[in-house]
Structure formats: C-alpha cells, structure tokens
Amino acid sequence: IGRELAVSLGLAQDVVDTACLAHDLGHPPFGHNGERALNQWMADFGGFEGNAQTLRILTRLEPKRFDSAGRSVGLNLTRATLDASCKYPWSLQEASVGSAKFGYFIDDSPIFEWMRSGAPARRKCVEAQAMDLSDDIAYSVHDFEDAVVGEYIDPEILTSKSGHESLIRAVARWSNGTYSDDELAQAFDRIACADTWLTSWEGTRTDQARLKNFTSDMIGRFAGAAIRDTLAEAGGEPLAR
C-alpha cells in the first residue's frame, strides 16, 4: 500500500516502503494492552510507547553500525527513512493534553533532533503521512477480513435492515458525532454496492477467494481516493522533499 501511494504521489518509494515495514517494530506482544502494561511498569523511568521504542530499535538497539566511540548507531538509516518511520514527532512532555502518544524517549533526543533538523515542529513529513495512511488502510480492511473469517461478523446479518441500522448506531457512537447517521449510511451503501461485497459466509474456499477479492478492492478504493484528493489539493506542486 505504501509503495502504491509513493509511486502515485511522486515520493521516494524505498523510504515509504521501509517506513511501512519498520514503524511497528517497537510494539510489544498483546497489542495496545501490552503497551499499556509496559507503560505502567516503566512510569518511573519516562514510560513506554511503541513508536518511541521503534526509533530506539532503529538507531540504538539493533547493532549493525558503531560510531568512533564504540556506541551503537543501530541500522545507520538515512535521516529521511528515520523521519518517515516517526508517527509522532514529539516527546511525552510535548504531547497534547490527554494523549499518551509520543515518538521518542528523552535520552534519544540527540538522534531525534538530528533526524528532524530543519523540519517544522510536530509536523509529520509527507512520507510519514503516507506510512500512517497505509497502516490505517491495512489494519482497517484486514480487521474486517479477520472478523468475517473468525465469524465475529456475519455479512448476511450486516446487510439486513436491523444489522445495517445497528452498525450505523455503533459507528456513530464510536465517531462521537464526527459523522451523521446519513453520512454513515451512505458510506456503507457505497461499500455494499461493490461487486465484491459478501452477502453470506460459510467458510468455503470460494468464500475465502471472494473475501480476498473484497479486501483487495477496498484497499485499492481507499488508497485511490487518498491519491486523487492529495494530488488535487497539491494543485500540481511536487510533494517530495
């Protein structure tokens, strides 16, 4: 997904691709529950955040290169690649009120400052934005796929009137008023009108193939919409640094 975005937007393909592969390296087992547990245990030492741990792995913990003083510089990646892998370019102390998301630990400040030299404070570079969007598209689509395969979601019920209405109400609550019921209903209808949409699931090989086709269709649709809107917003101006 990241490479498709990079190619279409004229970004450095290898930089975006590497960022997509690297950005979750610091996340622990058990997902965000594991991250919260580690954060509690490390509270007296500045806490724990998976994204900040990613930067530490790339620049210190993975021992591939060493400086003249014998200190590890990690994988010795380029400034652009490290910056593209940084989802939250700020420390815990600089994070927004109520947010526990940050991109580097205080004792990693020197490498962060080198990485972000000349960049606007708290603004992700365009390659990091492409990585972030790729991540959103990938996990959103594949979470749906996993839910269908695990039989947590029944496409037949989802498409029924009662299931449809329940879905709209649930998403409306989750979005906290960001989208109206009408907007959500229209969005669902657009997806359900896709030729690849599943109306039932019995777990057959044919169903599995149909589900794979649907997820591929959704990835292409979401990536394509982002590409079109981004190019239109840029007005022909180059996006690459």
Each predicted region: which residue ranges?
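Active-site and substrate-binding clefts of carbohydrate-active enzymes
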Residues: 205, 209, 213, 241
